Amino acid sequence: MDLQLDSESYWNRSSRAAFSFDDEDEVDLAPDLVSNGILADDTISEASFNNSVALNLSIKSILSEEALKLVLQEQALDDRVLPKGVSPEEELKLLRRQLQSTLYSPNLEATAQKLLQGKTAPLEMFKSLHEKQQLLDTLMAQGGGHAVITVLLFLKRTLNTTQFHGILRERPKALEQYLSYLKESGDLAGHIELLQLFGRHQEAALKQFQAALASGDTSTRKKHLQLLVDAYATAGVGVIPLYEQVFHAALKMQQLMEKDSALGKLLRDQPTPVEVLYACCQVNSNWKEQDMLKPVSPQRFAADQQISPAQYEWTALNERAQAQAYADLECIFERVPSWHPLKTKQFHISFDLTLAVLRLYELQAPSTVLQLFLSKMGNSVEKLALAQRVKCIKAVIDAMAGLKQQQELQQLKDTLPERSEEQFYCENALKSLQSKRWTTDNIKLKL
């Protein structure tokens, strides 16, 4: 036997021909595969692969063209891309599994995962109301976000209005996300309609009010505000009194700006009530009388817009001081006591008097104006400190006289320019202080 193996003739027999690894002797197997139909006709099957004859099957005999397209679409959306080099048998198994999951039973978790990752997923497989609710609840439990909006839009498209609103009513978080989506997408009408549907009339009213104010011109804003006021007056679902007051005040302001062209020229587009009040102060020519019958008068406008007395006084003070109409300042702060109408007008300020003095000083008001306001301060110590701060010499003298600081007055007099108005004023204060002291001493002697 060993001799046979060693002989050259044994290995040269055709039955014992050895396999050659040389390129020139390479065996070409392609014709066999083509003849068997494996590559020529896409012949792949889950049948037994032991018999090559059984491989003569086409994928078209298993899947229709339409079904195959669905499988390929689903595969394109799936992260589980087929690895390179997979055998035809394994590829067919994967395609058939994906086709079954796509056409017959919706995969809840897989679909939710795709949506949460921001990928597209076919939702039409979720046919029943229960399946659609399950998908929405699954996404809500995992955080939701844009995926929840995608499903809500699908539900709105495939369900009737009653079913869709019922789902939102049972899921407040989904409702809030859908409302946010409507707002961000600019569907203001849908946003307001949904708020009203769920009984949130106060929010709906504010949204309508904001939309009316955002209108292009004064005439359009007035029209929308009038519709808003009329709608809630007859709707049977009123808003809180504060909102009604705001709506009516805004309507009156638009009517005033439309009617008075001179006022409109002083204002920018969509002014605030305080800006309109400032313009009313600019066009007002009579500050001595408070004309409540004239809509453009500052006092009437402030009342219509329910602007606080402090805000009205501060606005008027700034406008008159900047216009250097200082004679009108005292009229702004004059009030007739309501308990005694026949009594003369009294000075009344609704905010801190110190702020008024500092603001007038900042606007470079004359010292006589500063002295007028400083004279209304009752505390002489505070008056002295503030007068020194704003460099109002006469007010400093008044405060020192009120504190009976005769020595300090004498020192101040010596620092003032000779024969100046302030020096004469200081001398008179010293004389008055000395006279009062002499009178007091005489009274004590008589007693």
Curated annotation (Swiss-Prot):
Principal localisation: membrane
One GO process term, biological-process aspect: regulation of SNARE complex assembly
Record's GO cellular component terms = autophagosome; clathrin-coated vesicle; CORVET complex; cytoplasm; early endosome; HOPS complex; late endosome membrane; lysosomal membrane
Q: What happens when the gene is disrupted?
A: Viable and fertile, with no obvious morphological defects. Strongly susceptible to bacterial infection, displaying reduced survival after infection with E.coli and E.faecalis. The initial phagocytic uptake of bacteria by the hemocytes is not affected, however bacterial clearance by the phagosomes is severely reduced. Phagosomes fail to fuse with late endosomes/lysosomes, preventing the phagosomes from acquiring their characteristics and maturing into fully acidified phagolysosomes. No effect on endocytic trafficking and starvation-induced autophagy.
Q: Which domain of life is it from?
A: Eukaryota
For this protein, the record's Pfam families field holds:
Vps16_C
Q: Where in the cell is it found?
A: Late endosome membrane; Lysosome membrane; Early endosome; Cytoplasmic vesicle, Clathrin-coated vesicle
- State the membrane topology: Peripheral membrane protein
InterPro entries attached to this UniProt entry: Spe-39 (IPR040057), Vps16_C (IPR006925)
Key words of the record = Cytoplasmic vesicle, Endosome, Immunity, Innate immunity, Lysosome, Membrane, Phagocytosis
Q: What does this protein do?
A: Essential for phagosome maturation and the innate immune response to bacteria. During phagosome maturation it is required for the fusion of late endosomes/lysosomes and phagosomes. Not required for autophagic flux.
Family classification:
Belongs to the VPS16 family.
Instruction: Quote the protein name from its UniProt record.
Output: Vacuolar protein sorting-associated protein 16B
The gene for this chain is Vps16B
